[in-house]
């Protein structure tokens, strides 16, 4: 069987460096020279006591990192501080990774190479230069773990460190944000930004001005979740979704009443299906002007829920609730939900009471959240494969960091089968064969259903496998930590962001030498993913820090990737008696299908970004306006100009401070109310905008036109409403002042993430936002 051994690449060409987006090979070479120069200061650093080391760090001049002559001294001090405080002595490659992050790059460091320590050193470097650093993780567990783990190093350099999780109170969050380095998950930072858009007093603000974002698992945050909207919702009296309509749609017959496209991304009613529903709904016309943007939209959403979203693939049902599965991580997507109509449709499909959604008070995508930071850098094990997206959407370069020890993992070429059944049989036999030797096996599957099917078959064959998926992800740290033990067989969904290294011999490395002698960890993939990056994340679990390891992927012509992205006439069907495809070109054909899938994913990202970009620009204008109302006398000055008579009356009764507060509350209320209604309008447009194509209109152009028109009137309407309230709000009978009780804000708010449905369109319309508040 053909194998390839993954080894450290040699010197990269200058052309390749430019393609990566890193400044130049010369800059990487300069960083390497600075790492080597740091050796000259190591003895001096070692001779300092802890207090002297801290003072030496404080004396460093790191304000201008690109020109600072103190970089070598900083590296020597950081290395010494790390060894004293964490018992970890950074390798040269870890210092190099830190320097490239200090240069504003995303670094690619293989699994097990010490990204966490490298990131902490980079964060300390920025902080010593006077910058405020947010180390952004993909979940609360990693935020707290890394802050507590790396905190002693950061504090040894005279800096402060804090962390934030979902349980943190407002006061704890404020304290954490005042630290030099703050660890927090991307969603918690986003939710703090959103909640700050409801405060009516500067003292209630929590989130500081963004400065430096250092992102762990950067490709996961910046690419996989870039377009995930974070949402702040409040109580409202919205209509309950029509459960009966959702059930009617569930009774439709596939092929006769509705059809799906070839890659099962879209579903639509047939004429017969439309007639059947129209009859059940009392003889209405679904395509009439009255129903096309309401009832027909509900029908399409219900179809999506019933046909395209599969239980144990896209979501699981646990504790009488629907939990979304993060497709790139294979675990429950905490706090995430689909757009309101789709969430309710899935809940109705599963016979679960629909959950309260409220109204959206504010929203921001992860991409827009990160783009607020003047400086962005990060680290991941698979940055190169995401290089194009990082350049296109964030203008970030990628710096690959060579491993401390050469990677000697052996990657076997794909084993390809004609049918999925033959592939599964071959996987079971292969795992059983490897398990008999005692070599630990890690099996990476695509979804919960596949992991459970494989686990069940292995157990029936006497293989003592353990399974890790979205249903038991609370046990992941323990399961993954022991996946390298002698004889272990672990079946897991996606491995991205698991945050725990697999050490040969188990967590205590007791059987390390014996497992290494057997060939190290053996990784089995049950099929290619839509992106090579996810394949590499799975493979990268083997061959950690120069350990031996191996990997092999099993695929079939019936796999989803092949069905959607490789034409049937390009799939060779000649196979052996076990159903394995004989041609040597099979792996190349899979590569082709994967490239097509990656291209489509990039298109989807770009097209969805085009819809979100306008909302992000409009939100930025609202934020600027709100900040002015909150921090300056703008509200009082504008209302004094608009309603001079009423202002003069109140000025005689009230102190300037109290009058200013009343004006601010009125202006903020109507601005927030207008933005909330504008977001609801945009959501309604997006749910039905694809129907514009039926009238030969470009959906994106129409969305932009309607959104810009509505936003232009938002400003005037908010100011007019504020003026009316200011003039008509009754005065209190017993004391000076104005009764603002009718300006009721939501009695409760909550946050969640929306697992959005991308809108595909190839045209980017030119945007121009009016200076609506100017």
From Swiss-Prot:
Keywords: ATP-binding, Cell membrane, Cytoplasm, Membrane, Nucleotide-binding, Protein transport, Translocase, Translocation, Transport. ATP binds at residues 94, 112-116, 501. One of its GO terms (cellular component) is plasma membrane. Its EC number is 7.4.2.8. It is a peripheral membrane protein. It is found in: Cell membrane; Cytoplasm. One of its GO terms (molecular function) is protein-exporting ATPase activity. Its main location: membrane. SMART domains: SecA_DEAD, SecA_PP_bind. It comes from the Bacteria. It holds the Pfam family SecA_DEAD. It catalyses: ATP + H2O + cellular proteinSide 1 = ADP + phosphate + cellular proteinSide 2. Disulfide bonds: none annotated. SUPFAM superfamilies: Helical scaffold and wing domains of SecA, P-loop containing nucleoside triphosphate hydrolases, Pre-protein crosslinking domain of SecA. Monomer and homodimer. Part of the essential Sec protein translocation apparatus which comprises SecA, SecYEG and auxiliary proteins SecDF. Other proteins may also be involved. Part of the Sec protein translocase complex. Interacts with the SecYEG preprotein conducting channel. Has a central role in coupling the hydrolysis of ATP to the transfer of proteins into and across the cell membrane, serving as an ATP-driven molecular motor driving the stepwise translocation of polypeptide chains across the membrane. Belongs to the SecA family. This is Protein translocase subunit SecA 2. The lineage of its organism: Bacteria, Bacillati, Actinomycetota, Actinomycetes, Mycobacteriales. The gene is secA2.
């Amino acid at each position: 069987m053909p194998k390839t051994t993954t080894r450290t690449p040699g010197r990269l060409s200058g052309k390749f460096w430019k393609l990566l987006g890193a400044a130049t090979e010369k800059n990487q070479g300069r960083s390497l020279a600075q790492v080597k120069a740091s050796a000259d200061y190591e003895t001096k650093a070692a001779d300092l006591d802890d207090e002297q080391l801290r003072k030496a760090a404080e004396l460093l001049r790191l304000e201008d990192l690109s020109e600072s002559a103190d970089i070598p001294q900083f590296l020597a001090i950081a290395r010494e501080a790390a060894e004293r405080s964490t018992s970890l002595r950074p390798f040269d490659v870890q210092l190099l990774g830190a320097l490239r992050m200090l240069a504003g790059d995303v670094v690619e460091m293989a699994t097990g190479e010490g990204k966490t320590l490298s990131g902490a050193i980079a964060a300390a470097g920025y902080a010593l230069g006077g910058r405020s650093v947010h180390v952004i993780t993909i979940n609360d567990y990693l935020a707290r773990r890394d802050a507590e783990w790396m905190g002693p190093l950061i504090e040894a350099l005279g800096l402060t460190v804090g962390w934030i999780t979902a349980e943190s109170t407002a006061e704890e969050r404020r304290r954490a944000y005042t630290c030099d380095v703050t660890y927090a998950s991307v969603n918690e930072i986003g939710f703090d930004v959103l909640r700050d858009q409801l405060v009516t007093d500067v003292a209630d603000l929590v989130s500081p001005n963004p400065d430096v974002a250092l992102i762990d698992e950067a490709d996961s945050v910046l690419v996989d979740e870039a377009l995930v909207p974070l949402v702040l919702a409040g109580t409202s009296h919205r209509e309950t979704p029509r459960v009966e309509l959702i059930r009617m749609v569930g009774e439709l017959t596939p092929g006769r009443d509705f059809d799906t496209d070839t890659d099962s991304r879209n579903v639509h009613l047939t004429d017969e299906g439309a007639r059947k529903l129209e009859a059940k709904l009392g003889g209405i016309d679904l395509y009439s002007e009255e129903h096309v943007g309401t009832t027909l939209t509900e029908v399409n959403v219900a179809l999506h829920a019933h046909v395209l979203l599969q239980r144990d693939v896209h979501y699981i049902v646990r504790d009488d609730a629907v939990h979304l599965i993060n497709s790139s991580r294979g675990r429950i997507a905490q706090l995430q939900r689909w757009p309101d109509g789709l969430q309710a449709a899935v809940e109705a499909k599963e016979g679960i009471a629909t959950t309260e959604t409220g109204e959206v008070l504010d929203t921001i995508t992860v991409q827009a959240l990160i783009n607020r930071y003047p400086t962005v850098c990060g680290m991941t094990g698979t940055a190169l494969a995401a290089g194009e997206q990082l350049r296109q959407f964030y203008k970030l370069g990628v710096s690959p960091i060579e491993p401390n020890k050469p990677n000697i993992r052996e990657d076997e070429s794909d084993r390809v089968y004609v049918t999925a059944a033959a592939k599964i049989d071959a996987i079971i036999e292969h795992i059983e064969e490897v398990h008999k030797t005692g070599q630990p096996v890690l099996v990476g599957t695509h979804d919960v259903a596949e992991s459970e099917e494989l686990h069940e078959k292995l157990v029936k064959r006497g293989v003592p496998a353990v399974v890790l998926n979205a249903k038991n992800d609370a046990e992941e740290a323990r399961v993954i930590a022991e996946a390298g033990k002698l004889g272990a067989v672990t079946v897991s969904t996606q491995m991205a962001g698991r945050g725990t290294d697999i050490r040969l011999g188990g967590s205590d490395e007791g059987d390390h030498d014996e497992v290494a002698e057997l060939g190290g960890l053996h990784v089995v993939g049950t099929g290619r993913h839509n992106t090579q990056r996810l394949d590499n994340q799975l493979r990268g679990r083997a061959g950690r820090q120069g350990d031996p390891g191996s990997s092999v992927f099993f695929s079939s012509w019936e796999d989803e990737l092949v069905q959607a992205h490789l034409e049937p006439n390009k799939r060779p069907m000649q196979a052996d008696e076990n159903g394995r495809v004989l041609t040597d070109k099979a792996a190349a054909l899979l590569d082709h299908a994967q490239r097509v899938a990656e291209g489509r994913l990039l298109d989807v990202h770009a097209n969805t970004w085009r819809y979100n970009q306008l909302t992000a620009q409009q939100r930025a204008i609202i934020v600027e306006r709100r900040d002015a109302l909150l921090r300056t006398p703008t509200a009082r000055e504008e209302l004094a100009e608009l309603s001079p008579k009423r202002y003069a009356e109140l000025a005689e009764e009230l102190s300037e401070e109290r009058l200013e507060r009343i004006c601010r509350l009125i202006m903020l209320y109507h601005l927030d109310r207008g933005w909330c209604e504008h977001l609801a309008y945009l959501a309604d447009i997006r749910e039905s905008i694809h129907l514009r194509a039926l009238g030969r209109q470009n959906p994106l152009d129409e969305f932009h036109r309607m959104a810009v028109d509505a936003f232009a009137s938002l400003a005037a309407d908010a100011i007019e409403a504020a003026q009316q309230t200011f003039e008509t709000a009754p005065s209190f009978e017993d004391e000076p002042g104005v009764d603002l009780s009718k300006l009721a804000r939501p009695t409760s708010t909550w946050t969640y993430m929306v697992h959005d449905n991308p809108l595909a369109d190839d045209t980017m319309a030119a945007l121009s936002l009016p200076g609506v508040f100017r």
